[in-house]
């Protein structure tokens, strides 16, 4: 593997053995509660496991229980695209609100305010794209450390 692609840092919510791999057996990994750095009274709104990490991308699966809602926030360092795998959420993106159901896809560009409210138990697959190549450092700062599930 080219040395420029090697990830030396630990990735929060990703098992250490899975870092910098071309194939990740994530089906054998457990999710962990996440409390993002913008949270107020959101004690583990999502349960997350990182599926893949590179310098520019973080791909994760997130479970959110019915009724859980995060506060309106935005990210200045990355774009997000999400696929709703299960359930239903009310998704506010900028000034628009959408009801997102299983099979739907949505995005919130860098710097755009957004908020999720789980109307049913929900699972999404989210891809965060960091154009500056600081995905791991930014992800670890967002989620408050390097919880790896070891």
Cite the ranges covered by each PLM segment.
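Surface-exposed loop/turn positions
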Residues: 68, 104, 112, 120-122
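A short, N-terminal "cap"/entry segment at the start of jelly-roll beta-barrel domains
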Residues: 1-56, 71, 143-150
């Amino acid at each position: 593997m080219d040395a420029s692609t090697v990830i030396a840092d630990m990735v929060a919510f990703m098992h250490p053995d899975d870092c910098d791999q071309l194939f990740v057996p994530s089906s054998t990994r457990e999710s962990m509660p996440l409390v993002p750095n913008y949270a107020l009274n959101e004690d583990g709104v999502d349960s997350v496991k990182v599926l893949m990490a590179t310098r520019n991308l973080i791909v994760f699966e997130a479970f959110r229980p019915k009724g859980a809602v995060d506060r309106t926030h935005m990210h200045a360092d990355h774009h997000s695209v999400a696929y709703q795998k299960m359930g239903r959420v009310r998704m506010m993106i900028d000034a628009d609100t959408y009801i997102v159901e299983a099979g739907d896809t949505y995005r919130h560009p860098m710097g755009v305010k957004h908020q999720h409210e789980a109307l049913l138990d929900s699972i999404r697959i989210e891809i965060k794209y960091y154009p500056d190549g600081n995905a791991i450092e930014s992800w670890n700062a967002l989620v408050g450390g390097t919880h790896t599930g070891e």
